[in-house]
């Protein structure tokens, strides 16, 4: 697929940028060389501390992956010159002290480009974040922001994806209201050729858009996603952060409310706190 895109990009005056996300198990020297040649960015899935990561990231035999993947991640990052990558983790109800996971990746493992996302799970899941978790999460985001400032002053900065904010040259207004563009200008392609609005919808027949041979055949669904923006969500009307989140994630809204035009209020609270910290910094 990448080779095909490279073969036609000059002909069509395009500049394709590829990102690969990996759990690390299949990384080899050959994979590292390919990533350095073809990938603008590489996303490396690691949830932080060994006990946190190995709670969910296990193989078919139930064995944790931490000890196998960390050396591979370190080798890949070194080969990329410490650039063009992100360590991407997920925190759950079991590790609301997620700054410990970020600091472990930075201080113990040597990674500086970091991202940590709140879990998206059914409310009755043991992993789901709760209202009682929110004050702890808010404290964690403030702790992270202050520690990043300390590191910056010490000349050893780290990057946290969700604190990257450009107040002078931000996204155009279209991106500010429509976000990722799932279902219209952004789609997930499965290994068997089916098209979905994004990876979160893969496997749900109600959200299959078409396939790579016939193109988008479910035009009604495409048109529904076309209207999925911040102005389609009444709850966003009075939110000060609405043009930073573009109404939020359609998949999160669907999981929380049953409607892609709904509002995942818990996620809104977390997002606003992240924006407060980013603006403070």
Regions found by a protein language model. Name each.
Residues 180-183:
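Short, small/polar residue-rich loop motifs at catalytic or cofactor-binding pockets
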Residues 51-56, 113-135, 157-171, 200-206:
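Flexible glycine/acidic-rich beta-alpha junction loops that bind and position SAM and/or redox cofactors
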Residues 1-119:
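Radical SAM/AdoMet-radical enzyme domain recognition
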Residues 135-169, 199-246:
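C-terminal accessory region of radical SAM enzymes
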